[in-house]
């Protein structure tokens, strides 16, 4: 349905991938979306919004957080990084996966509000939760292994 997708995993760290027509777009330097600088080198996206950052700041993992105030704070941090990734890549849709994204419903309204409030002159693409939120990396690795095996089998016969 969508040709150009930005996938962002928010888990222990933060990673991202661009997908065009169902295929990941490899880059020559293997950058990670979580390494973008938000304000200073100490404030990289994954240093303030990853599962590790959440556990470090609040003393508990995302699954244990019930406070709306805390989720608003987390949402502000997620919004900062997502906005910059969206501006840099201009995707049709953003898909969120990973252990923190399992809690999508707890933070997505606040993320959208923060993005609109802080950067109101840009139309945001839809931001959706991945279907297999926590298992996407494993499924992707399995599909890649299968594709590699098929390619190898075709080229050796």
Label each region the model flagged.
Residues 148-157:
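Acidic, glycine/GT-rich loop-and beta-edge segments that sit at the periphery of enzyme/chaperone cores
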Residues 1-2, 26, 112-113, 145-146:
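Short, hinge-like loop/turn segments at secondary-structure boundaries
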Residues 44-112, 119-138:
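Adenine-nucleotide phosphate-binding core of ATP-dependent small-molecule kinases
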Residues 55, 146-149:
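Short amphipathic alpha-helical signal-transduction/dimerization elements
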Residues 1-86, 153:
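Glycine/GP-enriched mid-protein hinge/lid loop-to-helix segment characteristic of carbohydrate kinases
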Residues 25-33, 111-120:
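Acidic-glycine-rich active-site phosphate/pyrophosphate-binding loop
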Residues 141:
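Binuclear metal-ion centers of metallo-dependent hydrolases, dominated by the metallo-beta-lactamase
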Residues 60, 144-147:
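Residues within well-ordered alpha-helical secondary structure of globular protein domains
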């Amino acid at each position: 349905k969508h040709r150009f997708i930005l996938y962002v995993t928010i888990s222990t760290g933060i990673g991202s991938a661009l997908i065009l027509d169902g295929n990941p777009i490899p880059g020559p330097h293997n950058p990670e979306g979580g390494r973008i600088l938000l304000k200073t080198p100490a404030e990289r996206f994954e240093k303030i919004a990853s599962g590790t950052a959440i556990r470090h700041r609040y003393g508990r993992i995302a699954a244990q957080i019930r406070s709306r105030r805390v989720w608003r704070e987390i949402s502000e941090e997620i919004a900062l990084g997502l906005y910059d990734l969206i501006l840099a890549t201009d995707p049709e849709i953003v898909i969120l996966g990973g252990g923190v994204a399992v809690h999508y419903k707890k933070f997505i309204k606040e993320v959208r509000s923060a993005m609109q409030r802080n950067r109101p002159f840009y139309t945001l693409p839809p931001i959706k939760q991945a279907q297999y939120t926590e298992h996407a990396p494993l499924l992707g690795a399995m599909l890649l292994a299968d594709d590699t095996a098929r390619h190898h089998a075709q080229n050796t016969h």
